[in-house]
């Protein structure tokens, strides 16, 4: 049974200082090798990118900011999501909802921040969390299209699956080097 309660809402606080321009704050894209690693590790072929734009989507079907993934119908069974990091809580709640109520498998790429309510929601509802160690993901700058080393937090992959038994969370760890090596060697 999922921990998500009907109509449950929270207010999230932004507590991390960043040098990123406010206009670009939530526009950093996932490197392809991270996406490919997630597909390989979880044995999933994603068919929906739930938080993307035309120029950075990882699959053909995607939900743009204008379409609003928090309200849009998710037309996919295996969903990838790298949500805006300024306020991930509503996206975590939406991923849990889609998994529990609509039989979707969702993998989220999130910061590691054990002090937040959304992290607690992940721990309570996810089937697996993969912590990325040894370095931080060099996200793709929205303006330049290049990987950047300006990331100031570690990341994790969070797997939500339908009918995952409550309290069955598995924690795993992968070094960024291994992740990149395996992600680049797919196909």
Where are these regions (language model features)?
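Class I S-adenosyl-L-methionine-dependent methyltransferase catalytic core
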Residues: 2-187
């Amino acid at each position: 049974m999922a921990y998500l309660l009907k109509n449950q809402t929270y207010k999230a606080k932004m507590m991390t200082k960043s040098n990123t321009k406010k206009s670009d704050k939530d526009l950093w894209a996932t490197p392809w090798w991270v996406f490919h690693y997630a597909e390989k590790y979880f044995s999933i072929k994603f068919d929906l990118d739930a938080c993307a734009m035309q120029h950075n989507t990882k699959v053909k079907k995607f939900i743009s900011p204008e379409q609003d993934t928090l309200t849009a119908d998710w037309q996919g069974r295996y969903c990838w999501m790298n949500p805006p990091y300024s306020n991930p809580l509503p996206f975590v709640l939406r991923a849990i909802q889609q998994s529990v109520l609509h039989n979707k498998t969702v993998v989220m790429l999130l910061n590691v921040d054990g002090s937040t309510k959304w992290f607690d929601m992940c721990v309570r509802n996810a089937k697996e969390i993969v912590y990325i160690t040894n370095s931080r993901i060099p996200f793709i700058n929205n303006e330049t299209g290049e990987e950047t080393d300006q990331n100031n937090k570690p990341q994790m992959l969070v797997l939500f699956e339908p009918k995952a038994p409550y309290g069955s969370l598995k924690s795993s760890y992968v070094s960024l080097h291994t992740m990149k090596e395996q992600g680049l060697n797919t196909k």
